[in-house]
Amino acid sequence: MAIKSTEKHTPMMQQYLRLKSENPDILLFYRMGDFYELFYDDAKRASQLLEISLTKRGSSAGEPIPMAGLPYHAVEGYLAKLVQQGESVAICEQIGDPATSKGPVERKVVRIVTPGTVTDEALLPERFDNLIAAIYHHKGQFGYATLDITSGRFKVSEPSTEESMLAELQRTSPTELLFSEDFEPVHLLEKRNGNRRRPVWEFELDTAKQQLNQQFGTRDLVGFGVENAEFGLCAAGCLIQYVKDTQRTTLPHIRSIVMDRQDDSVILDAATRRNLEITQNLAGGFNHTLSEVLDHTSTAMGSRLLKRWLHQPIRTHDVLNQRLDAIGELKSNGLYAELSPQLKQIGDVERILARLALRSARPRDLARLRNALQQLPELAQSTQAFEQTHLLELASLAQPIDSICELLERAVKENPPVVIRDGGVLADGYNEELDQWRDLANGAALFLSKLEQEERERHDIDTLKVGYNNVHGFYIQISKGQSHKAPAHYVRRQTLKNAERYIIPELKAHEDKVLSSKSKALAIEKKLWEELFDQLLPHLEQLQLMANAISELDVLSNLAERADTLNYCRPTLSSDIGMKIEGGRHPVVEQVMSDPFIANPINLNDDRKMLIITGPNMGGKSTYMRQTALIALMAHVGCYVPADSAHIGLLDRIFTRIGASDDLASGRSTFMVEMTETANILHNATQHSLVLMDEIGRGTSTYDGLSLAWASAEWLATKINAMTLFATHYFELTELPNLFSGLANVHLDAVEHGDEIAFMHAVQEGAANKSYGLAVASLAGVPKAVIKKAKQKLQQLENGQPKNQSLTSTQIKQEHQLSLIPEPSEVEEALAKVNPDDLSPRQALEALYRLKALL
């Protein structure tokens, strides 16, 4: 917007341009009456983003002014659209009185809505965290800070590499990201909405410490354990300053800052989070994910907490066993069924408290807070049955808070209006002075009814009515047919098509009295509303602790229900290396299958640290690998797992190299993506890591791919000693267990009958004897003629015939001849592979079901 000088503009446009100059990089919603208007480039941009009309408002300084507008009562919907697109908006309100203003009404920016700092319900995803973050980079080191303004959770970390920084961005998924003007690794910021460039000085360490100490009311940061995290503090300082600037108010609910230490967590890189489909599937949706299966929480704040747990599995066995003990108690006594309906009535207290802290809570927020507090006595009654220590701690924090509940019951009407603007929020009887002025204003109805009746009878005018509108105030209306009966002291105020409107001294006096009393009542109510905030805010910390306790109680109760309903078992956690799972199942796949899921065991230990997995495509290799990782992840979240039994050793990281696609935006081929992920694993995996490697080397020539797969497997097995599941189509790799200790071959079974194949999905010891690739191609719908040609070519290759030798017509004709010897049936082939002595009762029953299905 090129504006040389404001002198040539109208006073109103001068005011607009001054406010716009204070907020140059974001959209300015400028309040004019019942509309928010945008001008110049803001109007053009908003018309594109919101698909609203672009018009012109006269001219200023001799040029037409582009303009776009939207009604104030619908602003939340438009803000939601802008926030979703990563835009920020300055909300400019009229704060002066138009009746007394000389020149333009006084206006000022009262808040700035940004993607990471929104607290309004309409603008927030209900069951997902909404984080704002800041990133700092210096000499290869990173500082990273995140803030959830709706809860006050403020964290810093110091990722040591670009890979770990990328993993943190993937885990936290901030909707707004602040970075300095001299930030170098800008590729980390690609494909993100809500990036905000900030001045370099905002990231200075001394400035950051000053900002943080001011926020927490402390002299130093030693008590928070972050004083040595200088890079993290640089990011945190910029972040807290930005949030203060946008909110235009104090932030009393942000009282501490926490160091997010990688040593306490099982680290998941970006590829692993994507491949395991924890909260988002590979297509970007939310169905068929781990969280969809596990998240039956009763409250939105519980749902958000569960997702945080899933994305940050922990290594602290004391905490994990504490969670498992709590789930076990809730499951064994069935108490989760009693808690669930009570928790549903409590709602999203966490975000209500954030709006309370920012003094932006609306009347219905406080009504919902009151309703939540009214549920606590019944919840306390249910929690009396608790015995487990952690459950008792949570119950003690969720006890009734009678003083606040009683205050809100006295103060707020049962069903208040949406906003305080027009009053009618505070309950009758809450304040004597307010009641008196309300009674005076409400007495108008009786007065008007009485006046109307008296005037009708006195002047014999049966069409006479007393009414009111915002423009003309109170009036007496008489139809045109009877207007000749209007007495002389009736002063005509307005002529309509079919009626005349008049005013009389008594009505005018009453109008002044009523409007004065309404205005006085509204002023008193708004003052009392602000005082109500003052009474509630000293209890904010207690209320937040209550909300946190209820969130965790909701998650634990939910996980108990899931464990009971889905037949999960309690994992045994160990500090030893390895894992032993009997009857393991994929938590997501088993829920979407119509047939019974084939459970499989896995055993990894010091003598068996790598499994070379072979078998057909579609045989279940990837499912088997993913279910192992998901069971390990769930155990480190502290929840029950889909298995008959599970002993899980200590993990520091989970890596997955499963599937790949071209990264066209970065100019990386499928093979380049695969090798980048493989390099990350080979550099960062340890003996405490769980590594999933699926089909390494597919994207290049056979010998290159085989060589890379062999070398990678050998390195993992001999140098790193990581617990590894290594799926491959290179049968040469099945020789590795003969060459190195700690390796074993397993395969997923399949039965071929004629041109058909049945996948048994059962993991067997030893290597597969063939790949069944042509059978899978046939299942996929490859034309039969192509399959026949492929079979003939395969036979040539297996018999050592020259690769360029053509098939003869005689050979092709032979394909159509019938065999005189009947082929064994599919069931017979499957039965021949079953060894009854190797089967447990459950496996025998599953085998019987599979054989039955083949008939």
Curated annotation (Swiss-Prot):
CDD domains: ABC_MutS1. Pfam families: MutS_I (PF01624), MutS_II (PF05188), MutS_III (PF05192), MutS_IV (PF05190), MutS_V (PF00488). It comes from the Bacteria. Keywords: ATP-binding, DNA damage, DNA repair, DNA-binding, Nucleotide-binding. InterPro entries: DNA_mismatch_repair_MutS (IPR005748), DNA_mismatch_repair_MutS-lik_N (IPR007695), DNA_mismatch_repair_MutS/MSH (IPR017261), DNA_mismatch_repair_MutS_C (IPR000432), DNA_mismatch_repair_MutS_clamp (IPR007861), DNA_mismatch_repair_MutS_core (IPR007696), DNA_mismatch_repair_MutS_N (IPR016151), DNA_mismatch_repair_MutS_sf (IPR036187). One of its GO terms (cellular component) is cytosol. GO terms for molecular function: ATP binding; ATP-dependent DNA damage sensor activity; damaged DNA binding; mismatched DNA binding. The keyword Ribonucleoprotein does not apply. One of its GO terms (biological process) is mismatch repair. ATP binds at residues 615-622. The keyword DNA-binding applies. SUPFAM superfamilies: DNA repair protein MutS, domain I (SSF55271), DNA repair protein MutS, domain II (SSF53150), DNA repair protein MutS, domain III (SSF48334), P-loop containing nucleoside triphosphate hydrolases (SSF52540). Belongs to the DNA mismatch repair MutS family. This protein is involved in the repair of mismatches in DNA. It is possible that it carries out the mismatch recognition step. This protein has a weak ATPase activity. This is DNA mismatch repair protein MutS.
